[in-house]
């Protein structure tokens, strides 16, 4: 199973001006990081919690443990 492709997207604040704490997966650093979401628009690399981000994007895909 492969990591979802949206995990590679850069964080997008979106069109609105709210400052909602959110998390995105940084594919270069291989970890989830905080960013401010504007409240609308953006892309799928946007999670309400760091746990949700890690479960979706930071899990070990395609590697044997």
UniProtKB/Swiss-Prot annotation:
Effect upon mutating residue 17 to K: Increase in trypsin and chymotrypsin inhibitory activities. Complete loss of elastase inhibitory activity
Q: Spell out the CDD domains in the cross-references.
A: Kunitz_textilinin-like (cd22594)
Q: What is the effect of changing residue 18 to F?
A: Complete loss of chymotrypsin and elastase inhibitory activity. No change in trypsin inhibitory activity
Q: SMART domains in the record, alphabetically? A: KU
Q: What InterPro entries does the record point to?
A: Kunitz_BPTI, Kunitz_BPTI_sf, Prtase_inh_Kunz-CS, TFPI/VKTCI-like
Its GO CC terms? Answer: extracellular space
Tissue-specificity statement: Expressed by the venom gland.
Mutation effect (residue 17 to L):
Increase in chymotrypsin and elastase inhibitory activities. No change in trypsin inhibitory activity
Q: Which PROSITE patterns does this chain map to?
A: BPTI_KUNITZ_1, BPTI_KUNITZ_2
Question: Which Pfam families does UniProt cross-reference here?
Answer: Kunitz_BPTI
Primary location: secreted
Has the keyword Kinase been applied to this entry? no
Keyword terms, alphabetized: Disulfide bond, Ion channel impairing toxin, Potassium channel impairing toxin, Protease inhibitor, Secreted, Serine protease inhibitor, Toxin, Voltage-gated potassium channel impairing toxin
Q: Which SUPFAM superfamilies match?
A: BPTI-like
| Molecular-function annotations in GO | potassium channel regulator activity; serine-type endopeptidase inhibitor activity; toxin activity
Q: In this UniProt entry, which cysteines form S-S bonds?
A: 7-57, 16-40, 32-53
* Protein family per UniProt: Belongs to the venom Kunitz-type family.
Q: What else is known?
A: Negative results: does not show inhibitory effect on trypsin.
Q: What is this protein identified as?
A: Kunitz-type serine protease inhibitor IX
């Amino acid at each position: 199973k492969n990591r979802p492709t949206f995990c590679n997207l850069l964080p997008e604040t979106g069109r609105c001006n709210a400052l909602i704490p959110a998390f995105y997966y940084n594919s270069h650093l291989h970890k989830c990081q905080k960013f401010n979401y504007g409240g609308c628009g953006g892309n799928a690399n946007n999670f309400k919690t760091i746990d949700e981000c890690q479960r979706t994007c930071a899990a070990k895909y395609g590697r044997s443990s």
